[in-house]
Amino acid sequence: MARFLTLLVVSIAVALPLSAQDSPKLEVFGGYQYLHAGNFDGAGDSVNTNGWNASATFNFAKHLGIAADFSGNYKTEQSEGSTADVRIYTYAFGPVVSANASEKFRIFAHALFGGVHVPTGCFLFSGSPNECGASSTSGFAMMIGGGVDARMTKHFDFRVVQIDWARLASEFGAQNSNVRVSTGIVVRF
């Protein structure tokens, strides 16, 4: 299977015209991210978190590239005299299709596959010693979505919005009703 995928990627890269490219070879994005994680605890509860999103996209053809995407989201939940630090990290890779909507705007769509990691948080109970869980949980992550970049200068774009539907599967169960929204700066090389 790995041989087949390698052959497929190499064939596509060789077959596509690389010369008449009006998109940059490399784009690096960094910015703010909001994540709504549904069924976060396996009991149907959701959590709204804030954090960061970073990605790098290598464009090997005019409208086709491959991306590496990383993010971290955080929130302190308080309930019935206790607090819990929620941390959600994702790492994903996959194809990106992009097109110039005009001279000033570029649209893109991607399908990213990778993992999610939720480190153990400490639960602080009023009037009792701190209790920390013994293990973390990790699982499969899939993000499908896209966005719009606005040209600022030759080498800088503003990511107006990136919206993704995210499936995050961990020990807590599959979380299918997740939405992440990002905005920030894109550096083009």
Predicted region positions:
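Cleavable N-terminal export/targeting peptides
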Residues: 1-23
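Short N-terminal segments immediately surrounding and downstream of signal-peptide cleavage
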Residues: 22-39
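Gram-negative (and chloroplast) outer-membrane scaffold detector with strong preference
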Residues: 27, 55-128, 139-145, 150, ...
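Generic short beta-strand segments
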Residues: 32-36, 73, 163-166
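Surface-exposed strand-loop-strand hairpins of Gram-negative outer-membrane beta-barrel proteins
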Residues: 35-54, 137-138
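Extracellular loop and loop/strand-boundary signature of outer-membrane beta-barrel proteins
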Residues: 39-43, 77-84, 127-134, 168-172
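Subset of outer-membrane beta-barrel
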Residues: 46, 151, 163, 168-172
